Amino acid sequence: MDISISWVVIIVSVLSYLILMDKWRAAKLPKNIPPGPPKLPLIGHLHLLRGGLPQHLLRGITQKYGPVAHVQLGELFSVVLSSTEAARQAMKVLDPNFADRFVNIGSRIMWYDSEDIIFSRYNDHWRQIRKICVSELLSPKNVRSFGYIRQDEMASLIRLFESSEGKPVNVSEEISKTVCTIVSRVAFGSAVKDQSLLLNLVKESLRMASGFELADLFPSSWLLNLLCFNKYRLWRMRARLDNFLDGFLEEHRVKKSGEFGGEDIIDVLYRMQKDSQMKVPITNNGIKGFIYDVFSAGTDTSAATILWALSELMRYPEKMAKAQAEVRESLKGKTNVDLTEVHELKYLRSVVKEALRLHPPFPMIPRLCVQESEVTGYTIPANTRILINVWSIGRDPLYWEDPDTFNPDRYDEVPRDIIGNDFELIPFGSGRRICPGLHFGLANIEVPLAQLLYHFDWKLPPGMTAADIDMTEKTGLSGPRKNPLILVPIIHNPTS
């Protein structure tokens, strides 16, 4: 009995302390913070983020409380931005104040203690690695030079689909494999031997790292940190990734060159690592973190966008016919198809824009406000976590007519770009932290999609109609399809 009473006293004392701390933190906030829903003691608004994808649930909050709204996630005061004006102020006008990233348990473990580029803090390391990325690795010139790799892998994919003519195929699986091979040849200089292992590692780690952890939301609690079992699973996943990358990097050191003796991404990073003029030394973990960036952001997002575009086109046969007519007329008689040819395909590029609007590869962009700032009249305290809801902005009826409808023709009237200038459409972000692999990612979307539309007439499996296509998203950093896309390829015969 005495033991039971002691436990009750301890629990009541701990809860009382946490409630007092909660009130103390709330009292320190400025008066003019963004509005938000009524919150519960201790957990804040966590109860409002159950039973759906975060971008969907947060959209519901901003629709009710305004495009700039605060959410209390445990101990963490966070602000959601869901309008073009708010995004413009945070990513352009006040960009230095919002250029930092917050990290959580998943990103810290899987992205090598933020020594990569995606989750790096806004510091000299980030500036240096971004400069290397933009000038040495993924510049538009280098992206064009990778054209022969895209052509090789697409030729293999086309042969595979031709051999399966008239039969249902798992398009999701085959496109993921192809994009993975393209990325690995660019990054490593050759195709990865255990490609399926790498794909599974990336997909599973992205799934595990993308959710909310109680230990992240209550950072002052050593007990929750100790009991965060997903953290231990992530460390095991990290060990598997380390083992894979260490082995491959060692092979690369011995080989010393990529395909045909050319310099690949790892060669460039090793060269920079030996450069004594580097302001911040590049570590082995930094190299592995960058490679993981390339695969996690380059493979999953490009494949997901191709699949969303195909899914939408299958739901709208008239759009599919228009896209195929343009591709087949423009590419008729050409043996090599790459960026030069694809850049002339206006409607195809509108299809890609529309797929990115409805299904952005990064539905929410995380930022950290490093000093007190004012956004659309509201005060954002320093160290506030910022969530820019790109998915919600892309479906806002204030900016888009029939926002939930797939309509590539809308860009004939308002030709918005996707490189961070038009804040109605920012699938790759904007400002200093815009995705440095933007051109590489677009090339790996537009070129494969053009070839798939050129070579095949796509049909649904027997018994399915356009209304039966499952468009459900699943949890993940890239907003992928929940279920694989199964289609039937029919070889296009230009003379028939």
UniProtKB/Swiss-Prot annotation:
Compartments reported by the entry: Membrane
Sequence positions that bind heme: 435
Annotated Gene3D superfamilies: Cytochrome P450
Keyword vocabulary terms for this entry: Heme, Iron, Membrane, Metal-binding, Monooxygenase, Oxidoreductase, Signal-anchor, Transmembrane, Transmembrane helix
Domain of life: Eukaryota
InterPro entries from the UniProt entry: CYP450_71D (IPR052306), Cyt_P450 (IPR001128), Cyt_P450_CS (IPR017972), Cyt_P450_E_grp-I (IPR002401), Cyt_P450_sf (IPR036396)
Cellular component GO terms held in the UniProt record: membrane
Molecular function GO terms recorded: heme binding; iron ion binding; monooxygenase activity; oxidoreductase activity, acting on paired donors, with incorporation or reduction of molecular oxygen
UniProt cross-references to PANTHER family, sorted A to Z: OS06G0641600 PROTEIN (PTHR47953:SF19), OS08G0105600 PROTEIN (PTHR47953)
Protein name listed in UniProt: Cytochrome P450 71D179
Annotated source species: Thymus vulgaris (Thyme)
